[in-house]
Regions:
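N-terminal glycine-rich FAD/FM-binding segment characteristic of electron-transfer flavoproteins
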Residues: 1-248
C-alpha cells in the first residue's frame, strides 16, 4: 500500500511576517522557510504507518519553486522513500495544487493521501477537500487518530466540541490536525542519507495542468494593534470602571 504525502514550503512559524508598506503583499524576502507544521505531522503519520507494517511506500510531493527540494529532503530524512517535485515559480492556489496532486496520483495510484489541514501561510484549509472532490474519494479532514486496515481507514476527526470517528474506503484523503502525533526530530545523519534517496522532477505543463489563478488579492493589512491593558487596585475599582464603560 502506498501513501502520497503533500508537503508545502512555507514561512517558518516563528517568523513574524510584515506587510509591505504599500499593502500589496507580505515581505518574505530572506526569512526562514520550513515545512508546513501540519505537513510534518502528515509525514510522521505516514512513517508510523510504515513502521507498523501498514504501508509499504511513502512518496512525498511538493509543488513550487526550486527550494521546495529542501522541504522534500526533510520529508525523506523523516522516513519518506522517494520524492516528487512539481517545479514552478507561479503562485499556486489550493485548486491548482489539488489538480496537480490528482494528475500525479493518476500515475502513482496511492491508497492514502495525507495532507496538512492547512498551510500556515495562506491558511486556506481547502486543498484536501478539493482533492477528495476531484478524485471522488472519501475524506477525513482534521484527523486526530488514524487506523489503517486492508480496505478501509478509520479516522477520528476533530470537530466542534469533540471528535467524530469515520470509516472510509480506500483510496481516501486525510488531512492532519495538531493532535495526530508529535513529529520526530530530524537528525543530521538522516538528512545526509536523504540526499541519496530519489527525487523526481516534473512540472505543471508535463502533468497537463494549467496554472490559473482565480483569486485576486485586494490588499494586505497588519492586524490592529491591541490597546494596552490597565491594572486596577481593587475589585471595587474594577466594578466601577466596568459600570462607567457600560460593560455591566
Ligand atoms: P491549504 O489548503 O493551502 O491550507 O493547504 C492544505 C494542505 O495542502 C497543506 O498542509 C499541504 O499538505 C497541501 N499543500 C498545499 N499547497 C501545497 C504545495 N504547494 N505543495 C505541497 N503541498 C501543498
Amino acid at each position: 500500500m502506498k501513501a502520497l504525502v503533500a508537503v508545502k514550503r512555507v514561512v517558518d512559524y516563528n517568523v513574524k511576517v510584515r506587510v509591505k508598506t504599500d499593502g500589496s503583499d507580505v515581505d518574505i524576502g530572506n526569512v526562514k522557510m520550513s515545512m508546513n507544521p501540519f505537513d510534518e505531522i502528515a509525514v510522521e503519520e505516514a512513517v508510523r504507518l510504515k513502521e507498523a507494517g501498514k504501508i509499504s511506500e511513502i512518496v512525498a510531493i511538493s509543488m513550487g519553486e526550486k527550494k521546495c527540494e529542501d522541504t522534500l529532503r526533510t520529508a525523506l530524512a523523516m522516513g519518506a522513500d522517494r520524492a516528487i517535485h512539481v517545479e514552478t515559480d507561479e503562485s499556486l492556489s489550493p485548486l491548482t495544487v489539488a489538480k496537480l496532486l490528482k494528475a500525479v496520483a493518476e500515475k502513482e495510484q496511492p491508497s492514502l493521501y495525507l495532507l496538512g489541514k492547512q498551510a500556515i501561510d495562506d491558511d486556506a484549509n481547502q486543498t484536501a477537500q478539493m482533492l477528495a472532490a476531484l478524485l471522488n474519494a472519501p475524506q477525513g479532514t482534521f484527523a486526530a487518530k488514524v487506523e489503517l486496515n486492508d480496505n478501509e481507514v478509520i479516522v477520528t476527526r476533530e470537530i466542534d466540541g469533540g471528535t467524530e470517528t469515520l470509516a472510509l474506503n480506500l483510496p481516501a484523503v486525510l488531512s492532519s490536525d495538531l493532535r495526530l502525533n508529535e513529529p520526530r526530530f530530524v537528525k543530521l545523519p538522516n538528512l545526509m542519507a536523504a540526499k541519496k534517496k530519489p527525487l523526481e522532477k516534473t512540472n505543471p505543463e508535463q502533468l497537463g495542468v494549467a496554472v490559473e489563478n482565480r483569486l485576486q488579492t485586494v490588499k494586505y493589512a497588519e492586524p490592529k494593534t491591541r490597546q494596552a491593558g490597565e491594572k486596577v487596585a481593587s475589585v471595587a475599582e474594577l466594578v466601577a470602571k466596568l459600570k462607567a464603560a457600560k460593560a455591566i
